[in-house]
Amino acid sequence: DFIGKSGQNSVFLRGKSGQNKVFLHGKSGQNIFNSMINRKLDNIIANHYAQQSTALLLSGARQVGKSYAIRKYGQQNYTCFVEVNFIQQPEAIQLFRNAKSVADFLLRLSTFVQQPLVKGETLIFFDEVQVCPDILTWVKFLVESGEYRYALSGSLLGLQLKDIRSIPVGYLSEVEVFPLDFEEFVRAVGVGDATIDALRNAWENHYEVDAMIHNKMLQLFDLYLIVGGMPAAVQTYLDSNDMQQVIQVQQDIIRMYRMDIAQYDVAHKLYIQNIFDLIPSELNAQNKRFILKKVDRNIKFSRSENDFVWLADAGVALPTFNVEAPCMPLLLNKQRNLFKLFQNDVGLLACQYASGIQMKILNGETDINFGAIYENLVAQELKAHGYDLYYYNSKKYGELDFLIEENGEIWAIEVKSGKSYRNHNSLSKCMFCDEFHVKRSIVLCNDNVHVEDDIMYMPIYMIMFLQRHRRMEQMIYKVDIRGL
């Protein structure tokens, strides 16, 4: 996010001459949208405003690119783009809270930004709405007026908006934003459509990938393990190729997350910070399951559950829950007190490990627990692609790294970072257990594409093609009430 002086308004106008005049927390006329990063989010935003009349709310963790995406779209597609940031401009909170009507609200807004609003040609962006949740109660009335389009964004929304007195259902569409996924990353570093399409074809039809392309993709995968998907870290890498600069950006983001913990939950901040700081070491343990007693020997899960929920709702951690059995639906088999806790970005995870791990990853050194890092990346990809996160562990059958639901089926995913990727006793046992519902098995590894004994062995980088498909079939059902 681009941060300027407190109280600085953000307005974009396109004049008749075609020249842009920009005041976006930078110098007048400065074009800040020259990034090489193109995101799937850009298309989601464009499709929303082309197809729907609702306001758009972007939620997600800090520094994942929410505000930037809205500013970019607003600058490029609207005659007038107006932004109010409730953290940088706290005086706006009381100003809008005292509004008596939609007309009064819009008059206050126009006066505040010192700019007339152009009907039908203006996008109004309210940023950092977590500190002014009452703004959401206005959304219904603003959208109903139909004069302008609206966008909202904020962090920690899962925490701050729980007590909103009136969520505008039917007037607000929410999109959760995540760090760049692996496909977005490789496109940013220069991999073209032809290569992506060839890889997708290999994924869908189980073709072996050309050896040269396969090796290059593994190198890019290793690079992604340390750069991650935070837009600022990716842009820093693209600009400099300097890993030390990338690490500095990542460290700043981690510090910001810890500051948020201290600011937004004063009572439990020490517990939450301890949980957050323990994520790397817990993932490095043999079973990767989070052990609560490492936070406090005397605390019970029932007392600390909200601390874990805080991290999940803030978007900075990805809980992956154990299930009693790999059976449909997974949600009903979920064990909420048994879980793994992954970082929201694999680059941040690598940054939290020992100094120098980045070069060890790039050099392929074997004294690193790649399993934890690989699994974190897979969790991150699955979450960004629409899947809920589950795994299975039992004394009888062993452990399945991930379970997902796809088109009414359960798929099991094993993540293997070493050469012994064919050793997966747990997967084999669960596949042929009649009590379980595992219909497809995928082993993500460093080898090329091949299928053996009904198990798909796929290169780890092909996780980028595993996207959730929500199949909507027509369901017509009518109850015969004659005779009642």
Range-by-range predicted roles:
Residues 36-50:
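Pre-Walker A adenine-sensing motif
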Residues 88-120:
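Short glycine-rich substrate-engagement loop in P-loop NTPases that contacts/grips substrate
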Residues 447-484:
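Domain-level recognition of nuclease-like catalytic cores that cleave nucleotide substrates
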